[in-house]
């Protein structure tokens, strides 16, 4: 950890260098995901491509960005589904994607062939996701009307459902005890999405497109239903 003179000027203190010094592994495996997220909402993020790929540690991207336009919930939902599409790290395009553009690589992230170490990307959307969520605060409404958009399994092939802060019960599909990590349940949302997702992985370029149509319709319908 970097320790500075407490009497020194504030501008000499670098929070990121003190608490998270950049190296290839942390940037390519962590910062790159933030870069991909920023890239969906802000302009000029492509100038930090070399940093996100771990090639230029000195050209650090900003800690936060100003979105080009007001960010709506659906934009955030979809940013959670990113696999670096349209970038040099696009996981649908390299040899690991196979014949059906599968944007997933099984762990570990790095592997060795003939003495050369190679790297698999770690995208925003990953196959090992247990659950994911987006919190929506609406300050003009009572606190009880806040919404937690909640989903299970892979974000790219599952949908988000609005759950109000005032909710007093849990539906059976999300309830504790309805299935487990090792026990399949046909009424568990996790297991149903997990099953669908695993089918999609076999013919990803074809099946995921159909899943996305249903996902978009559901989320857009729900967004209209919760408008205030």
What residue ranges belong to the model's regions?
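Conserved small/polar residues in nucleotide/adenosyl-binding loops
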Residues: 1-6
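Accessory, solvent-exposed terminal regions and/or long lumenal/extracellular loops of proteins
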Residues: 20, 27-29, 33-116, 122-124, ...
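Substrate-recognition/cap regions that form aromatic- and gly/pro-loop-enriched pockets
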Residues: 97, 101-227
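Core active-site phosphate/anionic-ligand binding loop and the adjoining beta-turn-alpha structural block
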Residues: 8-13, 19-21
